[in-house]
């Protein structure tokens, strides 16, 4: 996904294309392949890249192209500024090579005074030579040695002819003339070799510039005439002034070129010998400085080639300075020198040259061919002077070299860089694939809550509401836009439009967010301790001793049936306080124990020392471990003789509860709730555990807590027990409790004393709720009662619709199976109790009694007395009313007698469960089994008119009776099952024949009786079944 950072500046697309030297389509295609489609915004000239990551990936991908583009720009900039720089470099080279040039000029003047003006160097021909020389360095270095031996240049021949005979006063010399003769000889030989190499440049280069013909002609003429004349003639010809010589006509130059070509072959050997003989003397005379004739020749060249006047002017300036400067000798070092230019003195970037089109080069060559012959002669002479008799590199070679360089750059990415790029591309591709799969999956999945409306579902799938309603209407369902749909209907609509449904938890749009407290505002609070354990293990007795009150006496059956919350200040422990929650131990109160574990800080697990770890004990351990609540074990009833604390610790270890005596971290104490032994030690360990936990709360804020219990009391209305977890609850505070709301009209503590406020970890009985919230609901103080009422009404609406949809329904296949097996029985119940926790516990326990044949259907449950409306509902639904700790009103009692509705009331919860179990067992069809009564053997058969076949039998075992069923077995195979139609003994009808007697009998609708058949008599017995859950 494209992300625009603050520091990144958007890049125009055309700028990026120019920077990377790639096409715009290529950039767009690459971004789409790499998954950066959103990184490109706009179109046309306004197209730009807004994602920094995409821009960096582009630069890395096309780094080679960008490098090539940068180099081309650099070459172009150098070409634009190259004129003066090249002139300066050329001038320096001329000064350094002044000594060999002076010798060459002397020999030429002696041989051919008329062509003295041709010794000058026009700038037009010199432009390409300095620039192209580095580019052609490798080629010239490789071919120079061989070519130098084969074809010595004309300059060398002229130098050889004039080196020995030129007078010393004709040209000034520098201080290099005083060097030793040996050093001069060596330098002269090196210069001669270099001149030979420079003279043998490829002919193609000279042809490209159109100057090679003139060079070869002049060089050949000079060499031939130098060999033909003797030393005296050369000496007398040397001092002739070149200034007075007129310019040689172009026609004569061409003629000389043709004749020189013929004489070149015969003169090559003579040139080699002359070069060897005169090389030492040439060094001695070499340091001659350029004469005034060179300056005049420059002026002439400038007039002949006005297009290159700027370069000529720079050259004139260099020549004028050359009259006073002295050139120093240096030793040429082989192939590092091309022509008269030292490549070591040039910077690497100077070798780069602007890439020119081939068409442009061709046009330039054609233009040069059309130039004036005199202009060509000037270029030829100037290049001869510049290049030492050899042609410089032309534009085609520069172009070829540049092409090769660019190709190397394009293919020059390292293997590691390519591997990195492939890995990055593969990683991007995998990430894009994962994103596409996630997007594809999310596009076809609808996350909806149960019972969404038709309009909401239509918005989720992106279809008009009318189309969804039409789809349901075609399926036989008439719905409205605001009607809430059940799960099956939602799945049907989603399937019609090609979606899958994923049901999520109901998102309460009216959820109340509780602000986090500042750590500086938190203060220590009392721990909330829940007492848990099995039935009759002494939980309430232990709590009673701590509270110094007899709570058990008020509990029916001696068991706790409510969750009691008590706030106790311990006088023996520096007035520290503990909030106790006493949970029931009966199995029906599993939900209460689970909620108690979630609302508590520490769990006291009470285990009787004379008993062992029981099922409810294991359940309490699981609740505490699931809630991640620390446990403190209280081994109770240590005052009894049969108490065995070690046995209890060992059994707790089996349940993954390791006490400190067994190397664990769970504290334990041996106590007796009857005598009080060990109670203080137990409380000390509880307080120590709370100090380790560092329990804190903020009392200076609006209260929030959890509902511990709710009930309906006469004269008080709905009473809820709230455990405040944070803040302070005061009288008059508006609150929200689950799906109900209200305002605190009054508050009482556990001893029923009225209080005005309660702080953290303190329980309170709150009056003023408009209903009975469920146990475990969140209790939150709101800003106003109206706000709380609005949120509660929205919650009630959702809850009401969900309850209507969640009514138990029997599917069609279940109905078919039950009809095949027999009648399906269902017991309808209406449950009323004094508190909400008891209603929930009793309902959950009864619903567990459901089997395939019988089931419990709770059609209504509530808190409070049994009313007349409950009786009428039971009459209409053929239900039984169960009351737990409540009684019917007078009107309800009369209505039940009139409508013949059964009302049963209980004070102990397990008594109600047992009665319902018995009622369900009565609805079960009895179990049928077969009981064998006797066996008889057929010894004879005879036919009786109007009766049929009669068998004479002997009873071997048991009895044979008239009302019994009979089974005929022949050769071990059952042939027939039926009933006995008649039974006689000595022509008298009898009802039963005992074992050891004979009788005659006939089987109803069966006459195929044979001697030896065995008859078995039996009866079907029905037995009542027990309910197995």
From Swiss-Prot:
Residues 183-196, 358-372, 428-441 have a biased composition (Basic and acidic residues). It is found in: Cytoplasm. Residues 373-386, 417-427 have a biased composition (Basic residues). Residues 636-639 are annotated as: G4. One of its GO terms (cellular component) is cytoplasm. Residues 400-411 have a biased composition (Low complexity). PROSITE patterns: G_TR_2. Residues 106-121, 148-177, 213-234, 242-258, 279-322 have a biased composition (Acidic residues). Keywords: Cytoplasm, GTP-binding, Initiation factor, Nucleotide-binding, Protein biosynthesis. GO terms for molecular function: GTP binding; GTPase activity; translation initiation factor activity. Residues 73-441 are annotated as: Disordered. GTP binds at residues 533-540, 582-586, 636-639. It comes from the Bacteria. Residues 582-585 are annotated as: G3. Residues 672-674 are annotated as: G5. Residues 524-696 form the tr-type G domain. Residues 533-540 are annotated as: G1. Residues 558-562 are annotated as: G2. NCBIfam families: IF-2, small_GTP. One of the essential components for the initiation of protein synthesis. Protects formylmethionyl-tRNA from spontaneous hydrolysis and promotes its binding to the 30S ribosomal subunits. Also involved in the hydrolysis of GTP during the formation of the 70S ribosomal complex. HAMAP family: IF_2_B. Belongs to the TRAFAC class translation factor GTPase superfamily. Classic translation factor GTPase family. IF-2 subfamily. This is Translation initiation factor IF-2.
């Amino acid at each position: 996904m494209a992300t625009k950072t603050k520091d990144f500046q958007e890049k125009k697309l055309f700028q990026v294309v120019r920077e990377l030297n790639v096409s715009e389509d290529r950039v767009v295609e690459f971004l789409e392949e790499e998954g950066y489609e959103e990184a490109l915004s706009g179109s046309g000239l306004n197209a730009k890249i807004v994602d920094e990551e995409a821009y960096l990936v582009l630069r890395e991908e096309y780094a080679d192209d960008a490098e090539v583009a940068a180099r081309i720009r650099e070459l172009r900039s150098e070409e634009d500024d190259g004129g003066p720089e090249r002139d300066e470099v050329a001038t320096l080279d001329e000064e350094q090579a002044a000594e060999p040039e002076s010798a060459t000029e002397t020999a030429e003047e002696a041989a051919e005074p008329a062509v003295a003006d041709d010794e000058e160097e026009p700038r037009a021909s010199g432009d390409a030579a300095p620039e192209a020389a580095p580019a052609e360095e490798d080629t010239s270095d490789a071919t120079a040695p061989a070519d130098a031996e084969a074809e010595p240049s004309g300059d060398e021949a002229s130098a050889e002819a004039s080196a020995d005979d030129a007078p010393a006063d004709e040209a000034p010399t520098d201080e290099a003339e005083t060097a030793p003769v040996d050093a001069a000889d060596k330098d002269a030989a090196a210069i001669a070799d270099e001149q030979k190499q420079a003279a043998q440049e490829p002919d193609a280069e000279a042809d490209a510039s159109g100057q090679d013909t003139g060079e070869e002609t002049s060089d050949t003429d000079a060499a031939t005439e130098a060999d033909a004349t003797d030393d005296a003639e050369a000496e007398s010809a040397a001092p002739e002034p070149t200034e007075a010589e007129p310019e040689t006509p172009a026609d004569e130059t061409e003629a000389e070129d043709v004749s020189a070509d013929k004489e070149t072959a015969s003169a090559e050997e003579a040139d080699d010998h002359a070069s060897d003989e005169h090389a030492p003397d040439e060094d001695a005379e070499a340091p001659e400085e350029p004469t005034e004739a060179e300056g005049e020749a420059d002026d002439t060249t400038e007039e002949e080639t006005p297009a290159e006047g700027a370069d000529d002017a720079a050259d004139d300036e260099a020549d004028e300075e050359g009259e006073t400067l002295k050139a120093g000798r240096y030793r040429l070092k082989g192939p590092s020198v091309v022509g008269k230019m030292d490549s070591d003195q040039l910077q690497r970037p100077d070798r780069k040259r602007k890439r020119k089109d081939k068409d442009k080069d061709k046009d330039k060559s054609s233009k040069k061919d059309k130039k004036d012959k005199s202009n060509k002669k000037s270029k030829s002479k100037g290049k001869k002077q510049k290049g030492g008799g050899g042609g410089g590199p032309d534009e085609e070679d520069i172009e070829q070299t540049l092409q090769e360089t660019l190709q190397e750059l394009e293919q020059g990415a390292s293997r590691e860089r390519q591997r990195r790029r492939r890995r990055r591309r593969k990683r991007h591709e995998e990430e894009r694939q994962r994103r596409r799969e996630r997007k594809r999956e999310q596009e076809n999945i609808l996350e909806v809550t149960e019972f969404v409306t038709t309009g909401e579902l239509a918005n989720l799938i992106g279809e008009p509401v009318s189309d969804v309603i039409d789809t349901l209407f075609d399926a036989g369902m008439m719905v409205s836009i605001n009607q809430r749909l059940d799960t099956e209907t939602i799945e049907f609509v989603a399937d019609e439009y090609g979606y899958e449904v994923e049901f999520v938890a109901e998102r309460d749009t009216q959820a109340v967010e509780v602000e986090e407290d500042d750590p500086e505002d938190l203060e220590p609070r009392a721990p909330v301790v829940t007492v848990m354990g099995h039935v009759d293990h002494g939980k309430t007795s232990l709590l009673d001793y701590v509270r110094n009150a007899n709570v058990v006496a008020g509990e029916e059956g001696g068991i706790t049936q409510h969750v009691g919350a008590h706030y106790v200040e311990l006088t023996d422990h520096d007035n520290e306080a503990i909030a106790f929650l006493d949970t029931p131990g009966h199995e029906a109160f599993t939900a209460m124990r689970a909620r108690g574990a979630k609302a508590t800080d520490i769990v006291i697990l009470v285990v009787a020392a004379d008993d062992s770890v029981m099922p409810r004990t294991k359940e309490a351990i699981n609740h505490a471990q699931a809630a991640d609540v620390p446990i403190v074990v209280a081994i109770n009833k240590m005052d009894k003789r049969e108490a065995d604390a070690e046995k209890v610790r060992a059994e707790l270890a089996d349940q993954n509860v390791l006490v400190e005596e067994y190397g664990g971290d769970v504290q334990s104490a041996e106590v007796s709730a009857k005598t009080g032994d060990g109670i203080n030690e137990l409380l000390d360990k509880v307080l120590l555990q709370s100090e380790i936990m560092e329990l804190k709360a903020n009392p200076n804020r609006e209260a929030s807590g959890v509902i511990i219990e709710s009930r309906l009391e006469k004269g008080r209305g709905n009473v809820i027990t709230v455990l405040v977890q944070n803040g302070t609850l005061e009288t008059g505070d508006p609150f929200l409790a689950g799906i109900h709301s209200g305002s605190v009209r009054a508050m009482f503590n556990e001893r029923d004393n009225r209080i005005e406020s309660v702080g953290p970890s303190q329980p309170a009985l709150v009056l003023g709720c408009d209903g009975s919230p469920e146990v475990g609901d969140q209790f939150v103080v709101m800003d106003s009662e109206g706000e709380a009422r609005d949120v509660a009404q929205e919650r009630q609406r959702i809850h009401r619709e969900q309850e209507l949809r969640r009514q138990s329904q029997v599917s069609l296949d279940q109905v078919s199976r039950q009809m095949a097996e027999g009648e399906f029985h269902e017991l309808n119940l209406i449950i009323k109790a004094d508190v909400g926790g008891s209603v929930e516990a009793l309902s959950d326990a009864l619903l567990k009694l459901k089997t395939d044949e019988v089931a419990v259907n709770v059609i209504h449950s509530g808190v409070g007395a049994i009313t007349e409306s409950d009786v009428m509902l039971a009459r209409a639904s053929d239900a039984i009313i169960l009351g737990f700790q409540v009684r019917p009103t007078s009107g309800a009692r009369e209505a039940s007698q009139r409508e013949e509705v059964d009302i049963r009331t209980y004070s102990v919860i397990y008594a109600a469960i047992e009665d319902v179990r018995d009622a369900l067992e009565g609805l079960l069809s009895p179990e049928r089994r077969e009981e064998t009564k006797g066996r008889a053997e057929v010894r004879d058969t005879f036919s009786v008119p109007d009766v049929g076949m009669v068998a004479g039998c002997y009873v071997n075992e048991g009895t044979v009776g008239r009302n019994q069923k009979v089974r005929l077995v022949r050769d071990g195979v059952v042939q027939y099952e039926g009933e006995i139609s008649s039974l006689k003994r000595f022509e008298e009808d009898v009802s039963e024949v005992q074992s050891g007697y004979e009788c005659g009998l006939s089987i109803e609708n069966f006459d195929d009786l044979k001697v030896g058949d065995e008859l078995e008599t039996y009866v079907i017995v029905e037995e009542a079944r027990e309910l197995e859950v």
